[in-house]
């Protein structure tokens, strides 16, 4: 590149520096930097010249050029010659000082240039800067800034000049009056001092190692004098901060005696500024530097300033941190650093100041002080070593503070103490207890808002930090092990530490394991030496009980069990082996569940089994008694945890059951009865469970103790008449009685069965009844307390169940049975019949269920009362509650219903005869006929249950008639059509059971399965659907089954019952009765022959009435008989029915399809009527020039509707199959010629008004009607798969519309080929006569249909290929372009359907396709597009010699389409180009290779095409082009980057491609660049942006020898135009390309 070209390139970029888009401007700067990387001197000179010549250029753009120069200089300054460096230094100096005003961006950029040059030419830069320092005159602020920056960037180069600089600056310090100038001086002095300190700290690398601090001390002190005594007094806060920042590093350079002399003024001066400045970080940082300097010189003055320093610093640390800004947080760190300096120099004075402040009640003061204490404990450990006792004693008051912030700070201090040995001192245990207390804080008391800087609210909570601290201290601080063990054990049992159990257990487990590793002696606890520790019994009970709620407290169950397992040597020496086996099983069970999935009862039973096994292994009565005593003592601890207290009662019962001492057992039982909190329901239940478990081993003692308690003074006081009204409330007495009644119930339920029967009536029930009713003044008073009632019912239920489950139940005579049943029924009747609030009626019915099974049997009236009372109590309840109404309510409802079912089956079991069954059904009959659906559903469900039970337990000893079969079937069968689905299902089950009962009474075995009866089960699915047609069809089938299995003698009773059902208030059931009556008449009407005419007549007359649907089958039958004699007349008369057809007419049409022969005759007549008339008539209603409207003719339309109705009947199937080809072709042509056809005006008006309820709801629109009929024909002919495929693909909807009709015909052909292939030969034969149809729509439809058939192999398999090709070839010259296009598509489909036949027909196919490329005058003809798509499919399959002759012509013909405005043409042409390349792999002629090379650039650029399909086609084409270019690297790059579905990083890919292109095809540079120039003018922004990017990469990878191929001036000019493109992205890429052109040097 000549110098003029380089200059032109730089000039072009510099002219673009004024672009308004910041990204473009940044890219221009980057391009300039690229030029500078290659040609730094020329680029820098061009920039210098540009700035010099454009003196009026605005300062933002001057700054941009200067920044570009700085970036070049930062890496290429070493390549500058002295003259260039001098020129740049002068330019930057001039730019920097051109204006005296502060223009920071511009002056900063110029300063940056000087600093960059100064790294290499420090002397020249310093010379220029010193030249700008005029004696007695204030320097420019930018000069000061540059000197400061140089001091940091090149300290070794600047520091030797410092004396000269300072000598020039110091005299004018006093002259500086403006605050901005003074700030600049302060910044410079700060940087000078920092540079000097760096120089002095690294003298071994310094150019002059003889430099000492004294060289600067005098000048620095002079500057200090001005800064401190004059400028620090300024009112400008920014200046004061700048002064303070400078004083910090300057203090290290002051002479020692001067620093000592100035400290009394300096320190108060700095401290005073704390009150004036909000941002105190710089003050604290500088103060820390001054303190370090003072300490380093051993200042004595510091001692006198200490009080003021501590007070000021303490006030800073106590300031609330309201912001999480870095400066605020950094200030805290700097203040603490100051405290560290003071702690190391004056520890006593520091503690004397800090510790008294811990006693203050002010939150900020206490938190800040604690923060400092923690810091000095960690940072000045050596100085604090002998101060530990004082620090510990000072924590007394902070430990009592309830403020959460103070608590957090205290916990952090204790953590620091633990690491440094404080907690081993006297008083350390108080700290540990404090941590445990904080671990026990309840979660609900945690602060909701996080502290400053906290991302997770929980992470900073007092409890969370305490838990972490306790665990870390226990596990990581070895010296704490002997302090915490076994001390932490004493926190396990107190209630106030319950919340800390989980962290306590985890820490204790870790400590215990460490002790075990140290040896048995170290692990075993000496309880004599640790009197405050809980006993082994207390620990065992506590840990076992809290494990019953294992997921509370962050999983305390698992933690407690692990601790219990680890402590086994300290619990009892025999437990080791057993606990090591069982505890892991319990832990594994917890791991398998969550809090939501854990079955609580099962878990508690596992724990109780663990306890029982443990007691059995110990087998020491004294130990067991001691454990029971401890468990009883712990009862008050769980008053606020009812579930755990309930479990504790169970543990007590289990432990007492294992005890052998009767005295201990009775004593503890007495104490439990006396101390129980009877007002709590959970406690009453727990107490009862305890007595029940204890009774397993001590029945006599348990009952005796209950008797003793009743006779005791405590109990008698509670029930005395005076106490009822005075001392105690009646409610309290009822609670005590409830508990006692429950105790007796649980004793009966748990005690051994062989012992309990003898006690039931004499002891247990006597006491239960005695406690339930009380006599006052000789009068029996019944309780009103529902809780007491429920306890009575529960206990009686448990007693009854115990009797029933006993092996001696059969011989047991229960004398109080009738009394108890009456009592239960009284409770049931007392419950509200419309709501279910308590489980009383459920429990009472369950009790009755058990009582019914016990001797003696109930009399008939009592049985009836029980059944009637329970049904009335349950059946009228509102429907089953939904889940959202409450899971408990739904559960109670279901359980109550199950209790009723169990009771009824128990009663039926006592009378297993047809009469007994009928009695039960008679009780249910009113509910079966109830007008309320939920009552019918329940009644049918219960009936089905009873019938199933009766059938399962049927025992027939002799053949007897089931005399009430017809009556019962007549009651249930109409319910198969009930509005409630559940009722319908249950009705079928009832009929099913009744039929099998009849078979049983006929002598068939119980395992016999009747085929007819079994069909009922398969019909149940049909009853799920609410569709009446399906429902009544199922009812008809049920009627057929009944008719086949009903004995002749039962027919009359059944019919009579059915006729009664016609008046059923539930209309659906009435209709079902009609359906079943008709079925019975058809199947069994022989015995009622004289009644048939009358019945048919009645049903036909009902058809004319509004509610005559139930007689419709009879009317249909009549029409059928008429049609068998006069088919043509019936068809003609029905076709005259007005459109749209009403529902009665539709049903009559369907009746004609009952018999296949008649159906075929009817279909033939309808086809004839449809084909006879024209499908539509054209009408010009308004404007003469308007396209005429097409209006459907009535006769074909009526015939179409009739065809649909006839074929919608299943019986029409054989007739439809017989006429399949004719029906399919006629209906397909009907569809094609009705697209866009309108209804006659009168029918349109009816459609707008809406059909009446009696009219069919089917769409009458001509095309939709034809499509529906075609679909119905396919369904009826067995082509369901075709219909399903069309449904899934939306084919039917496409057929209905003008825009989608062609695609709909295509999809129909595809579905036919796939699922109805054998039908096609006859269909095509019928279609043959339609090729020359006068209707264009019909030609398009048939061509689309035929074209798609070639897409399937069915054409070849059925030997239809030749005929299809001939049919399509004949249409190549059709006047309709759509037909010609579809012909090409069909020919191309041969590639998919019969690929092996393509070679045979190759010339014919290629000729047609190539001819299609030139179809018509329109270059963008859809026929041409179809030809390209077809060629892409065929080229791989034809013979290569057939393709060669047209290959070049095709490539040339499709090339213009690459840049077509139409996306479809771009996609098709590019993809075809890829296929042509694929075919030519390894055998590419030169003329075609030239086309490949010519297409390379367009393909690469269109990868950025706005249309994704075009970009995808380019990916494919490039992958195919790769092998033809004979460059493995390029081909590999195409394969790697351009795979489908892989994200393309276009820049990276283009860079790689250009590298390979230029390496292997260097001669293509000019040609490729010329193509790029063409795309500079592309209408697509992305492509226009890709072109200069492509250009830049080509140039980047080119070699200098390729320069002759490039017209650089033309390229620069074109890119210069792009720099003015409206799209920022294009301008950015153009600038980037210009930066790359430097490569052509």
Curated annotation (Swiss-Prot):
Top-level taxonomic group: Eukaryota
Keywords for this protein: Lysosome, Membrane, Repeat
Gene3D superfamilies named in the record: Leucine-rich Repeat Variant
Keyword Lyase (UniProt): no
A GO-annotated cellular component: cytoplasm
GO MF, one annotated term: membrane destabilizing activity
Family statement drawn from the similarity comment of this UniProt entry: Belongs to the MROH1 family.
Name used for this protein in its record: Maestro heat-like repeat-containing protein family member 1
Organism annotation: Homo sapiens (Human)
Gene label: MROH1
